[in-house]
Curated annotation (Swiss-Prot):
Name of the protein this chain belongs to: Ribosomal RNA large subunit methyltransferase F
GO MF, one annotated term: 23S rRNA (adenine(1618)-N(6))-methyltransferase activity
Listed GO CC annotations: cytoplasm
Subcellular location: Cytoplasm
The enzyme's E.C. designation: 2.1.1.181
Catalyzed chemical reaction(s): adenosine(1618) in 23S rRNA + S-adenosyl-L-methionine = N(6)-methyladenosine(1618) in 23S rRNA + S-adenosyl-L-homocysteine + H(+)
GO BP annotations listed: rRNA base methylation
Family: Belongs to the methyltransferase superfamily. METTL16/RlmF family.
Highest taxon of source: Bacteria
Residue ranges, annotated region (Disordered): 1-21
Source organism: Photobacterium profundum (strain SS9)
InterPro entries: METTL16/RlmF, rRNA_lsu_MeTfrase_F, SAM-dependent_MTases_sf
Length: 338
């Protein structure tokens, strides 16, 4: 492909200032890092280099290129039909966690292999642990209820020297449990993180994907791409959930996001001293009052809400701790002053 000069960089709205993906994608640089991306890159109707974000193969190859270019992860893949997350948004959560730790550490981000994170629902992609380990040197445990996700994540870790010794994978054997069976009695985590299932049923997940397809079709019409709009419309009748990727555990659970996080809060209260900051993404703003009430009921000492935005999408992190001020000081002196 003939190299095309990128247009002047433009910051993506709302991303964290340390997020390396805050500029427009430099496809020429990405292709140099990952030549396999080449056939997926073409000029769009505005004369910019881009990929077709409705094509799962293109999105997966873009992720592979981003992980190689920015995080020195050369070997990355996921099984067909598994969630292929947008890297910029995933990186944002990591950088906001770093800020959260810094606020508990006199403004200094704790870095290095003595800092331990736990990713609940790591998925086959292993993206949160990859970014956290490469950006800050943190060690991770990633858990999942799906055996193939664990197998895929292990393969990614074992296939990249840059991840050696940085990430462990644990299978959650009971799908009703979150921390139980994953956090052992002697485990110490400086933080946990989670992108919980959003929907309450397969029907709700399917409807959400159909809505996404309709929005893509409407945007394509608006931009004058009738051919692409027709393709989106056709895909709406062909298992839309699969068009965007994601297995059952990644997309939905009984009771949806609220029920999942309520369980997480309850289980975290059984392990108050195993972790400094428990955290989760909360996509639905209307779930916040019930979650705050649950955190009050389990006597969380401190609760923080961190707003995040990427373009039109707005979400937030809710983080909580059970450690007293004295325990927090002791934790900081023993673990973060190294």
């Amino acid at each position: 492909m003939t190299q095309k000069k990128n247009k002047p960089t433009q910051k993506k709205k709302g991303l964290h200032p340390r997020n390396p993906h805050s500029q427009r994608y430099d496809f020429n640089a990405l292709i140099l890092s990952c030549p396999d991306l080449t056939p997926f890159v073409a000029e769009n109707q505005f004369g910019d280099l881009s990929v077709d974000f409705s094509d799962p193969a293109a999105v997966k190859m873009l992720n592979k290129a981003l992980l190689h270019h920015f995080y020195n992860v050369e070997n990355w893949d996921i099984p067909p039909g598994y969630l292929c997350p947008p890297i910029p948004g995933r990186a944002d959560y990591i950088h906001h966690i770093a800020d959260l730790l810094a606020k508990s550490n006199e403004g200094v981000i704790p870095q290095g292999k003595h800092i331990n994170g736990l990713d609940i629902g790591m998925g086959a992609n292993c993206v949160y642990p990859i970014i956290g380990h490469r950006a800050y040197g943190w060690r991770f445990v990633g858990s999942d209820v799906d055996a193939l996700s664990i197998k895929s994540a292990k393969f990614i870790v074992e296939s990249n020297r840059s991840l050696a010794g940085g990430i462990k994978c644990r299978l959650q054997k009971k799908s009703d449990n979150i921390f139980t069976g994953i956090i052992n009695a002697n485990d110490i985590f400086d933080f946990t993180m989670c992108n919980p299932p959003f929907h309450a049923s397969l029907e709700e997940a399917t409807a959400g994907s159909e809505r996404k397809v309709r929005n893509l079709s409407a945007n394509a019409h608006k931009k004058g791409s009738n051919k692409k709009a027709e393709l989106f419309a056709k895909s709406n009748t062909n298992k839309p959930v699969l068009n965007f990727g994601g297995q059952k555990a990644e997309l939905w659970c009984p009771g949806g996001e609220d029920a999942f996080i309520q369980r997480m809060i309850t289980e975290s209260s059984d392990k108050p001293e195993n972790c400094f900051w428990y955290s989760t993404l909360v996509s639905k703003k209307e779930n916040l009052p019930a979650l705050y009430k649950a955190l009050k009921q389990v006597n969380a000492v401190d609760v923080r809400t961190i707003d995040m935005a990427q373009g039109q999408k707005v979400t937030r992190i809710v983080a909580w701790t059970f450690l007293s001020k004295g325990q927090q000081t002791q934790w900081r002196e023993e673990r973060w002053s190294a």
